[in-house]
Amino acid sequence: MSEFTNLTRSDLKIVTDEGKELWLPTSGVFTRVSKSVRSIYMIDGVPITDISYHIDGVPDSAASGENYVVSWKTLMTMKALGYEVDDIYAPDSFLRDASGKVVGARSLSRIV
């Protein structure tokens, strides 16, 4: 069975439709997106900022049978930058408490 390594800063609780709970504690290793401003200029009075994104803490794809959990922003940026993301997932269908705070997710999703 495959294992999941949580590369986010928060512990993650997955609650399936059947009520089964799976806890994915943060691994202490974080994969995140960083942004660099490359230039700022104007077009017809509108400020334009050219930016580039970078991924810090990319997991070693050679780890056999390992699956990784990152944020949606990180997953989408990795895909856009051409990283292989077959073994990288993000929380989906968030669960919220009465005050609207995210307390878990119903599933993990990946980009295919």
Language-model-detected regions and their locations in the chain:
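Intrinsically disordered, low-complexity segments enriched in small/polar residues
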Residues: 2-13, 18-112
